[in-house]
Amino acid sequence: MRRSRSSAAAKLRGQKRSGASGASAAPAASAAAALAPSATRTRRSASQAGSKSQAVEKPPSEKPRLRRSSPRAQEEGPGEPPPPELALLPPPPPPPPTPATPTSSASNLDLGEQRERWETFQKRQKLTSEGAAKLLLDTFEYQGLVKHTGGCHCGAVRFEVWASADLHIFDCNCSICKKKQNRHFIVPASRFKLLKGAEHITTYTFNTHKAQHTFCKRCGVQSFYTPRSNPGGFGIAPHCLDEGTVRSMVTEEFNGSDWEKAMKEHKTIKNMSKE
């Protein structure tokens, strides 16, 4: 009996102890559950504070990134209206019309029944439509004159000149003309045209430097020059002309060694370079 009572008492004491420990564990669990949200909030606030501190402690060397605009937006600009003073200005005038280019073919000309004659004339003269028209107009303007062509020996210098088919030649005996055998006829500057070779021409002057003695750099031939007696014209060497346009030549001696006296005595030489 005593043993059964003591064992029952021991069971009761064990139950009481387990109940006490369970009761004490329950409040602890509830307390832990109650503390969990606060701990979470504490960790969140700590992380937010850390991020803020990192933002504050960001080194100043790092510049904020600029927002790039697209190329189209850059071209279009901010879209602001033009200033009022520019808005009041009239629009620029339209560009002038393109001038008509010279015709190079007879098909662009209204020649009517003269077309065949015109084309035959072009072929014989070996000219373009513009060149043929120029030749006919020059012939009309320089009535009684013919077009002579000529140049130096090597062909680097070429020219054309309108003059009579019957040439009046001067044979000067001044120091330089005697040395270079300068026989020439005189024409106004407007009737002379250098076709090519300006870069191949060199000029020699002396004394008064009014006479411009021009020579070809390549072959040394003087085919024309500017005489002292006629600074507004040209002296053309007849022996440098192409064959076929000279009908006759008359030669007159000019006493260039006594130039002032010869100029006073000659009544027409100055007028030979005038129109």
Swiss-Prot record:
Principal localisation: nucleus
PROSITE patterns linked to this entry: CENP_V_GFA (PS51891)
Location(s) in or outside the cell: Chromosome, Centromere, Kinetochore; Nucleus; Cytoplasm, Cytoskeleton, Spindle
Disordered: region residues: 1-109
Impact after mutating C174A: Abolishes chromatin hypercondensation phenotype induced by overexpression of wild-type protein
Alphabetized InterPro entries for the sequence: CENP-V-like, CENP-V/GFA, Mss4-like_sf
Compositional bias (Low complexity): 1-10, 17-51
Free-text comment on the cofactor: Binds 2 Zn(2+) ions per subunit.
Ranges of biased composition (kind: Pro residues): 79-100
Residues binding Zn(2+) 1, per UniProt: C152, C154, C216, C219
Cofactor(s) required, per the database record: Zn(2+)
Omega-N-methylarginine found at: R43
Domain CENP-V/GFA: 148-260
A Gene Ontology biological process term: ameboidal-type cell migration
Alphabetically ordered keywords of this record: Cell cycle, Cell division, Centromere, Chromosome, Cytoplasm, Cytoskeleton, Kinetochore, Metal-binding, Methylation, Mitosis, Nucleus, Phosphoprotein, Zinc
Function comment: Required for distribution of pericentromeric heterochromatin in interphase nuclei and for centromere formation and organization, chromosome alignment and cytokinesis.
Similarity remark: Belongs to the Gfa family.
Protein name, as recorded: Centromere protein V
Gene behind this protein: CENPV
